[in-house]
């Protein structure tokens, strides 16, 4: 549901990261050993000259998510990136950040972004996603975020959970 909503509002989503981001593919297949894995979203930034791996998580960020995105970034760097391109960055969009865990992340090309689901009562019930950036991250990565502080996207519920 989260990926579908982002894809429905792709232009708005990309604009929140700043200028130069282009969408390559959702569920981008990569082969690791004899198995295929799928990157939630693969982007490219023409100004930073690098790929961006986006992983969407509906819960609090866990150490396994960091290992997963780092693996995906390494696969892109080894198999897709050219010698003239910069290293791939990774962005984990999660329901809840874990600042304690991120103190120990050694790869400075991995970022976390938190979203919040808020119930909105109207004719058709829907959710809003709000990306909250800490002031520290905004200052450190303002070139990457383009100075934006939040984005709202509507997710229409289609029954079920």
Predicted segment positions?
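Charged, terminal alpha-helix-loop-beta segments
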Residues: 1-161
